[in-house]
Each structure stands twice: as C-alpha cells, then as structure tokens.
C-alpha cells in the first residue's frame, strides 16, 4: 500500500489462503498473481524486470505454527529458495526479507538483545527464519545479491488476522465476551504499530547494502495483562478477563 502511494509499480504474489486484505483502491493499482511463493518457476517469471523483491510470505500464528511445524519450515525454506532463484535469473540485486524477533528465543526473556548476539530460536518458524538469514548472507557472498533481513517485534494494526492477540482481544471486548489471557498475563511483548514497521521497511529498502540484519521494535514492553486492561478500557467493555492454562512454551515467547 505504501509502495503504491509512493508511485512505485508493484507486483503482488499471494495465495489468498487467508483472504484478500488489500484495500480495493490499492488492489486496482497493483499487478496481482494468485501464486504460491514456493512455485519457483512462476515466481521467477512474474518477478522478471523487478528492481527489488520484498519477501514477506509465511505461515503466521503461534498455534498454526505449533500444529504445522514441518509445513511452516518447508514454506519458509522453499519460499526463500524460490525468491533467491528469481533474483538470480532475473539479475535482481536487492531483497528485503521479513524475519522475526522469535530468533532470539529465550535470550530475549533474560536481557536486552541486539542484532549481533548469538541467537537461540525455539520454534520451527523462528528456526526457518534464522536459516533464511544465513542463506541470504551466503547468497550475497556467492552471487552478490544484497539484502536486508528485518526482525519485526509483534507487529499489529488494521486488517490483522483475529487469531493474533490484539485483534482477538478487541473482538472479545467489543461483544463483551471474556478476554482470554494465557497464563498469568505477566509475559511481555514489544508491540510495534504496522505504520512504524512500514516506515522502517521502506527506509531500509532504500539502504540495502551487503547483507544486514535489523531489529524493528518500539523499545517499550507491555504485559499481556496490561494489554487486556487497556483494550477493555478503550472499548468500554464489560468483559471479564479470564486467565487460562497453556503450555509454558506457548506463552513465554511468540513469533514476531
């Protein structure tokens, strides 16, 4: 959406398995292909003539990833291979890749982290994201293709899937259903507004050099319990906040 508004010619590849969330006025301005990112031949054909590839295709959602670990990794790894092939055969020398804060794993629970720390991914999603970061580094060394890998921290905003925590809480609060919180609610997240994430992404796309990794976050932690209270207050909801049990690994960390 932001790229179109800047006057760029944009080509979109998506399976639409979760529906079409592109606004109608923007959809009319893009060239759209309903294609799976793992379809190497199609991705290469469609991306011919492009100056840059933004690779943001992935399976998202903690529960979905937990239930489909192999499929999650296959789509991540094969999707990246497809994008790398397209960049190579079409002589596209820049890739912007959506990685995740999840690569830090338990390390992020214990201390502040930066891009240079030795990471400790704990989910199939985060492991695959880290693999792809390493792959991009080798792609630069071997093929000269430059890239930026962006480790997003819990992005939220309009049109987000309601299986994610913020839209789920809003949905529950607006109909006065119980707001369900896993565990104590003391687990923390660094929530990043999608507008800030977009600004950072576009800025980094203009400064792609070598292979670099960046964190995109707001530097302020909030607990899930605080989030539930804020959303309840914002919506003037009569919802009760229900704390429910979940496996420890489920709520200590989440994909970003």
Predicted feature locations:
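A glycine/serine/threonine-rich, flexible loop-to-helix segment
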Residues: 111, 162-170, 252
């Amino acid at each position: 959406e932001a790229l179109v508004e800047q006057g760029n010619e944009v080509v979109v590849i998506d399976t639409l398995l979760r529906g079409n969330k592109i606004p109608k006025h923007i959809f009319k301005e893009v060239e759209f292909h309903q294609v799976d990112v793992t379809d190497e031949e199609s991705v290469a054909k469609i991306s011919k003539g492009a100056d840059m590839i933004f690779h943001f295709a992935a399976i998202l959602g903690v529960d979905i990833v937990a239930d489909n670990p192999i499929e999650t990794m296959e789509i991540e790894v094969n999707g990246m291979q497809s994008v790398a092939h397209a960049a190579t055969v079409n002589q596209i020398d820049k890739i912007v890749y959506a990685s995740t804060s999840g690569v830090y794993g338990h390390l992020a629970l214990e201390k502040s982290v930066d891009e240079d720390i030795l990471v400790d991914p704990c989910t199939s999603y985060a492991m695959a994201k880290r693999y792809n970061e390493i792959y991009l580094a080798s792609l630069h060394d071997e093929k000269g293709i430059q890239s930026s890998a962006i480790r997003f921290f819990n992005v939220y905003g309009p049109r987000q899937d309601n299986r994610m925590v913020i839209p789920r809480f809003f949905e529950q609060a607006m109909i006065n259903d119980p707001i369900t919180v896993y565990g104590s609610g003391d687990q923390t997240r660094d929530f990043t507004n999608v507008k800030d994430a977009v600004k950072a992404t576009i800025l980094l796309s203009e400064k792609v050099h070598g292979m670099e990794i960046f964190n995109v976050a707001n530097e302020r932690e909030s607990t899930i319990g605080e989030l539930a209270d804020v959303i309840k207050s914002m919506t003037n909801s009569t919802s009760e906040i229900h704390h429910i049990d979940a496996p420890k690994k489920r709520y200590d960390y989440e994909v970003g």
